[in-house]
Amino acid sequence: MILFPAIDLKGGRCVRLVQGDMAQATVFGDDPAAQAERFERQGFSYLHMVDLDGAFAGKPQNAAAVEAVLARVKIPVQLGGGVRNLATVEAWLEKGVSRIIIGTAALRDPEFTRKAARLHPGKIAVGIDARDGRVAVEGWAETSDITAEELGRRFEDAGVAAIIYTDISRDGLLTGLNIEGTLALAGALKIPVIASGGLASLADVERLLQPDCAKLEGAITGRALYDGRLDPAAALELIARAKTAA
């Protein structure tokens, strides 16, 4: 299992939102690249980044901050936010992003998403953000009538590397992951699923290491790390021990 530390970008700074509300942004740092280096030193093996401004604008808005991170760390980076066309996908891959997350466009333009996955196998993830079981788009500002499972099934044979599933109702609240909902989605799809939204403690990491979570590729954590509620060393040690035992 991979534990992805999150860096969410707003105005070039590291922030965390509560339930996707840009008005409830807490700034945790002015130097995203320094934060990325810190995560790398702590032993994390893969970084999760979101251009929040880009998600709302429909095109990248924090390119300088992302490029600074790519220049400073060696660990792979997955990036989402404002990815709506192939030109954006290819520009980020050329700059060194390891995996691109397509969110809103997966619902609005599924053919683009499938084409991106075909052209760049293993490099495209679909971000499915759900509110009360329904997919939310445009930086979570709009909720559709499509369920997470329905959207995921559209990409079963497209070559998508992963589904990143976020329960918006828990995001940024440190109330624990929606394990039941995440496992239900993972059980319905062939694509590996990454859990996001609410991971708050070492107990959540332990839960993710149980046998019934074996299909999950990993989980994303943000606020718990910034608030000091989750000890990176303890979490990564737990994961390493579980891997050795397996």
From Swiss-Prot:
The keyword Cell membrane does not apply. One of its GO terms (molecular function) is 1-(5-phosphoribosyl)-5-[(5-phosphoribosylamino)methylideneamino]imidazole-4-carboxamide isomerase activity. The active site is at D8, D129. It is found in: Cytoplasm. This is 1-(5-phosphoribosyl)-5-[(5-phosphoribosylamino)methylideneamino] imidazole-4-carboxamide isomerase. It holds the Pfam family His_biosynth. InterPro entries: Aldolase_TIM, His_biosynth, HisA_bact_arch, Isoase_HisA-like, Isoase_HisA-like_bact, RibuloseP-bd_barrel. Keywords: Amino-acid biosynthesis, Cytoplasm, Histidine biosynthesis, Isomerase. The lineage of its organism: Bacteria, Pseudomonadati, Pseudomonadota, Alphaproteobacteria, Hyphomicrobiales.
